[in-house]
Design a protein with these regions (language model features):
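Extracellular glycan-modifying ectodomains
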Residues: 1-238
């Protein structure tokens, strides 16, 4: 019933412009960028900002790029060695701590056109970049979190591929996060009442590239609302 608030993470990202917050070749942020974007949401919910280094140690352990060191010793040509040693030492691309307990139940359409559900670790060992978080072309996902924010309710995240990269951070605060793929989840609106009740949803976050907002081909999950003109209560944060 309350009006929505539009949050723009750009001002927070600009504070960290010298960190590796954007992929160099893709229109998306890195896990580091997604971390700072998430802080804007958590601050709106009344939480103090998290410490990135403390979170990295929880997710990735204390591993600090030994694979890069090994590669720089193996390739001795000066130019190649310089390129390797200059690579970003972001642990997200190097090692993922298998002790991280977070996992998700992913629902997607298989090759036969049937809906299939599988349980997997939230961050994948065999993928890198945003694919390590997104995985297959899913419809929706239920992420088990740590719930350290002690919220009474949970969170529904309606997100594109960029938005889902915030999931490991949001699941720190909530016990469960229901993630709807804005590109694929055509049944979201018709099942919304059931989802809100079943998963005790307290907050709904819609996270999408502003360039795609309002384009029905990029918003399958919300298209019924667009057609009905049901998104007029959004107010912009000052």
């Amino acid at each position: 019933t309350d009006p929505s608030v539009v949050l723009n993470p750009l001002s927070e990202l600009e504070k960290h412009q010298y960190e590796y917050i954007y992929f160099r070749t893709r229109n998306s942020w890195t896990m580091c960028g997604a971390f700072y974007g998430t802080q804007v949401i958590l601050e709106e919910l009344g939480y103090d900002k998290e410490n990135l280094n403390a979170y990295r140690e929880y997710v990735f352990g204390v591993f600090d790029g030994n694979l890069l060191l090994e590669a720089s010793e193996k390739y001795t040509a000066d130019e190649i060695k310089k390129d390797i040693t200059d690579m970003e030492r972001d642990p997200f691309y190097i090692y993922i701590n298998g002790l991280n307990p977070n996992c998700e139940e992913l629902t997607f359409e298989n090759k036969e056109g049937q809906k299939q559900t599988l349980k997997r670790q939230m961050i994948q060992f065999n993928s890198s970049g945003n694919r390590a978080v997104i995985g297959t072309d899913y419809e929706h996902s239920i992420v088990e979190g740590r719930g350290k924010g002690q919220r009474k309710g949970n969170l529904l995240l309606i997100a594109d591929t960029r938005g889902k990269m915030m999931i490991s951070y949001l699941s720190e605060v909530f016990e469960k996060v229901y993630v709807s793929n804005i590109y694929e989840d055509a049944d979201l609106i018709q099942n919304l009442d059931e989802i809100l009740e079943k998963y005790n949803i307290e907050y709904i976050v819609w996270a999408q590239d502003v360039a795609e907002t309002g384009n029905m081909s990029h918003m399958m999950a919300l298209n019924p609302l667009l057609k009905e003109g049901g998104m007029s209560d959004v107010r912009t944060d000052p």
